[in-house]
Amino acid sequence: MELAYNFVQVVQDAILRPDFTSVLSIFFLSTVNELTAVLPYTVILSSQLLFIQDPFSVAMFTKLLLFIAIPMGIGAAIGSSLIYGLAYFGGKPGIEKFGKYFQLSWEDIKKMESKFKGSWYDEILFLALRLVPLLPSFPVSAVAGILRMSPVSYFILTIIGFTLRMMIMFTFVGLGMGTLAQ
């Protein structure tokens, strides 16, 4: 029980009083979590605003963006790049070998790929999927790799998507707590 309390206290300090150490911790946590997909860390990090004493302000929003959301977005992009890379380079052999277990063939992938032309609205769709707070990133990263999305677009849109996802959660929780306090 004490270990759980200490964990909550450490996370709470990292969110409510961020410093260089907490930035590195958030970066490392998000990178590792994208590789292992253990925790819904977007929810865990944003729930720490429930313990906030001060009103949710522009200054706090800016601090959360700079010290929490951006490092988390960069870390998550680095972590999810491994899944993307495996799907990008091993997608066809993997689908041909294991696709029968999922009732999926390379022809199915080609049909799906023909619907995506590599235009701006494909990237908007990818970004929208990255914004959904409870959607696991593994399938989104794998599909982006299999469909051979540009690595530069993937990395940039993943950083933007994860950063905005975190800020959306902070905004909902922060403004929700402000409403409850009134």
Task: List PLM regions with ranges.
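Transmembrane helix boundary and interhelical junction motifs in multipass membrane proteins
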Residues: 23-52, 132-143, 152
